[in-house]
Amino acid sequence: MKRASSTSASKATAIRWRILLILALASFVSYVLRTNLSFAAPEMMADLGLSEIQWGYVLAAFTAGYAIFQFPGGVLGDRFGPRRVLTVIAVGWALLTLVTALVPGREAFSTTLIIAALFGVRFLVGAVHAPIFPVMNASIVRWFPVGGWALPLGLASTGLTLGGAAAAIAVPLVIAGFGWRIAFLALAPLGLLIAVAWWWYSRDEPADHPAVNTAELELIRGRQRVGDTVESDEPLAWLRVLKNRDVLMLMLSYSSMNFVFYIVFNWFFYYLVEVREFAATDAGFISSAQWIAGAAGAALGGWLCDRLCGRLGLRWGCRWPVIVGMAASAALLLVGAFHGTPAVAVTALVLCFFFNQLNEGPYWATSVAVGGRHAGAAGGVMNTGANVMGIVNALLVPLLAARLGWTAAIASGAAFAVLGILFMLLVRADRTVD
């Protein structure tokens, strides 16, 4: 394949950043098409006659499918390449969003059958969304040099938070005018657009992209560690990822952080409408502000992690943003749960999500550093545990709310944030699985 020429020995092309842009757009669309259910919750629950605990089962279905297919998603991304896998799953996002809109109502199905139908569809939605971040992880490790992963990972995570912000405004507005079914139908084509764009422009390896010049290729490869680009033929190589102590501690820490994340993902909009008694459209704008704050936190966390890794090394450079982010999010979550003034509580919860997302880039950079050439699998293990915690959240939060009230349900996340700090202190990002 003809390589793009470089006009200057020091002037590299910027194809890697265009690849990152499409990845960020993919994470944006993925989050629009997975958070839509949370923002449709009050309307759907009323229309379909579901209680909070029954709705928790529906939410758990997504995270069950997402968790089960995380590790296989990492394996698929490493084996078949990010280009094929992301294209296929993006088509799946679109199709299953359409299917969600077709779930029958109370006039056709009993409550049990409605829950079963929603559970089945949302399980499949979780399954096809599961590979996105392991695949993104594997793509970034191919396209960016060692020591420069946290910033692109943080920027890619910014796409997901902006997707949540967009859905928080768009979904309630469309529902107010046309109903929840039309909202799902209108969003479905976004998945097809991502599939087309990614297949057309991306390549699994920088060397295979005709627009990458020699200078950019040398920049990407110049700082790789020995062995990073060598593919292992050992059949049991994947088992080392599952058995590695640092990967397991990282999974437990990231899982703890994600309990707080799932309070936002699953329940924040519902909490604003049903507990704090905001109008749905107002709650949408507040939720959007929270997701935008998360986007800023994700971008800052990635940049900060790269800077700290350069000064302190991988071990503490990846730890410090997580320690600060988790401690601050725990404190702000308690303020949001216990303060009686809605404006103060909401402000604290918005800031809580900023600090929660400060951790995203550092966590994924750690998974890449620890995973080495098995970065996709390491990311899959980490995110599998995180989404098992999503199932716990979907079932535990409404149970706590029913028995102890919503204050206790929201505040429970602070304990998990503290656990996340303790587990992260046991992770060493400066040693790999190999």
Please provide the spans of the model-predicted regions.
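C-terminal transmembrane helical hairpin of 12-TM major facilitator-type secondary transporters
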Residues: 315-362
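Cytoplasmic helix-loop-helix junction between adjacent transmembrane helices
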Residues: 121-160
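C-terminal ends and interior cores of transmembrane alpha-helices
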Residues: 91-111, 327-340
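A late C-terminal transmembrane helix in Major Facilitator Superfamily
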Residues: 298, 368-403
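Hydrophobic core of transmembrane alpha-helices in multi-pass small-molecule transporters
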Residues: 96, 109-131, 332, 343-358
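Extracytoplasmic gate region of multi-pass secondary transporters
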Residues: 37-38, 243-299, 357-360, 364
